[in-house]
Amino acid sequence: MNNEPTKIPQATAKRLPLYYRFLENLHASGKQRVSSSELSEAVKVDSATIRRDFSYFGALGKKGYGYNVNYLLTFFRKTLHQDELTKVMLIGVGNLGTALLNYNFSKNNHTQIVMAFDVDREKIGNTVSGVKIENLDNLENKITSDVSVAILTVPAAVAQKTADRLVNAGVKGILNFTPARIAVPEHVRVHHIDLSVELQALIYFLKHYPL
């Protein structure tokens, strides 16, 4: 198995966790092999795209046989660094932040929120699902070197200022749930998740592109 890092298109990289989750389900059900058409039906990605995605990693399957589920699962587990725990911090413990803490990636044993911050004096010091809520004023003193990813669920008005503090503290990745489009240096990656925008887009497609 090739363990060298492979540079792949970002669109492909975003689909890898989707493949991995389905492969986990297949493995749990005892299935030993799967075809690209079966994968396509399950993850709603056309089979040609799946084959192209997989081709970036070399020969992962055999023509006429398909893919060995256990082999693929092991391969993508290593590719997605699922053999190691990724510690994450949460900034903002409002309704969404609290929901994320309660969920805390329970279906993914390799990602875990280990610290949370807020400015609300009534929340500071409380514990939600085993995670103590710290004072955001103490952010820089509390961040440890093994936590380089942050989830941002603060009000949009303070999103950029908070992101600046995270970057200065050494954070390398931010999952931004705020409506603000935050600016960060080139060495920091941000993924924006705006639930309102996603819902508006869904409604638009339902009205203009009915199935």
UniProtKB/Swiss-Prot annotation:
Originating organism: Halalkalibacterium halodurans (strain ATCC BAA-125 / DSM 18197 / FERM 7344 / JCM 9153 / C-125) (Bacillus halodurans)
Protein family: Belongs to the transcriptional regulatory Rex family.
SUPFAM superfamilies per the UniProt record, alphabetical: NAD(P)-binding Rossmann-fold domains, Winged helix' DNA-binding domain
CC terms in the record's Gene Ontology section: cytoplasm
Coiled-coil intervals: none
Function: Modulates transcription in response to changes in cellular NADH/NAD(+) redox state.
Subunit structure as annotated in this protein's UniProt entry: Homodimer.
Keyword terms of this UniProt record: Cytoplasm, DNA-binding, NAD, Repressor, Transcription, Transcription regulation
NCBIfam families attached to this UniProt entry: PRK05472.1-3, PRK05472.1-5, PRK05472.2-3, PRK05472.2-4, PRK05472.2-5
Cysteines engaged in disulfide bonds, as pairs: none
InterPro entries: CoA-bd, NAD(P)-bd_dom_sf, Rex_DNA-bd_C_dom, Tscrpt_rep_Rex, WH-like_DNA-bd_sf, WH_DNA-bd_sf
GO biological processes: negative regulation of DNA-templated transcription; response to redox state
DNA-binding interval(s): 18-57
Pfam family, one: Put_DNA-bind_N
Protein name: Redox-sensing transcriptional repressor Rex
Gene: rex
GO MF term set: DNA binding; DNA-binding transcription factor activity
